[in-house]
């Protein structure tokens, strides 16, 4: 028999919210869950991700130390 009044309250239909919209309902110890990033607004999944070009850093290093690349 479990001890009484030591277990958290269980909410079986706690809504998961993002930007004011309900995404889904799950079981939780909190009555409502708020998420900032999810599948619908993450840059990787929405194809709005930008790539960082680091080629300039290598060129600056080679120039700074007077090294020749294979192309030169």
From Swiss-Prot:
Gene3D superfamilies the UniProt entry points to: Ribosomal protein L31 (4.10.830.30)
Biological processes annotated in GO: translation
Major place of residence: plastid
UniProt keyword annotations, A-Z: Chloroplast, Plastid, Ribonucleoprotein, Ribosomal protein, RNA-binding, rRNA-binding
Entry annotated with the keyword DNA-binding: no
GO-annotated molecular function: rRNA binding; structural constituent of ribosome
Annotated compartments: Plastid, Chloroplast
Gene Ontology CC, one term: chloroplast
Free-text function comment from the UniProt entry: Binds the 23S rRNA.
Subunit structure: Part of the 50S ribosomal subunit.
Database matches in PANTHER family: 50S RIBOSOMAL PROTEIN L31, CHLOROPLASTIC, LARGE RIBOSOMAL SUBUNIT PROTEIN BL31C
Family as reported in the entry's similarity comment: Belongs to the bacterial ribosomal protein bL31 family. Type A subfamily.
Name of the protein: Large ribosomal subunit protein bL31c
Organism expressing this protein natively: Thalassiosira pseudonana (Marine diatom)
Encoding gene, per UniProt annotation: rpl31
């Amino acid at each position: 028999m479990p001890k009484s009044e030591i277990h958290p309250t269980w909410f079986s239909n706690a809504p998961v919210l993002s930007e004011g919209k309900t995404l889904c309902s799950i079981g939780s110890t909190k009555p409502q869950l708020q998420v900032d990033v999810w599948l619908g607004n993450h840059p990787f999944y929405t194809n709005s991700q930008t790539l960082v070009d680091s080629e300039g850093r290598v060129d600056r290093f080679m120039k700074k130390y007077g090294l020749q690349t294979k192309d030169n």
